Amino acid sequence: MEYERGKCKWYVALLIVVSMLLVGMGGMYLAGYVCYGVFPYMAPMMIAPIPLVLAIINMFLLPVTTTFAEDGLYLGIGVNSINNKWIAILVPAFFYAIQHSFIPMLLDGRHIMYRFLSFLPLTIWICYWYYKNKNPLPIMIGHGILNVATAVNILVTSAVPGVYEMML
């Protein structure tokens, strides 16, 4: 990836993080309406309880590993390796969204489509912004924050199962 130290201003990073949250949540809500006819639709199985020790490990591993692996692959290799602008944006964005379609792994076509459509607007936006600016840091910060939020939700539902039951 083409990171240059000092290139990222704090206000740009903040703007990217906020826009990632808005585009990400908007994509999930819209996909929920398209696939399930419910607005807003939130898939409760995404933060279902797991053994507490795994939830604690997940809290530390998920944000770091997925942020570096996914952004390095789809932005660093995907976007940077393709010469045509729109193909460089759309192909990595497509596979970025496909990857998230199977988390959690449910062999249900509607759920897979919901997950794909949830992430597609965000992954297109991320790939477009990176293609235009070649600065991965704000995207990685936003991605890390989204992953921390997911890990915190999983930790809470795992530590206090009653919280998850209230969501159903």
What is the role of each PLM region?
Residues 1-66, 158-168:
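Juxtamembrane helix-loop-helix connectors linking adjacent transmembrane helices
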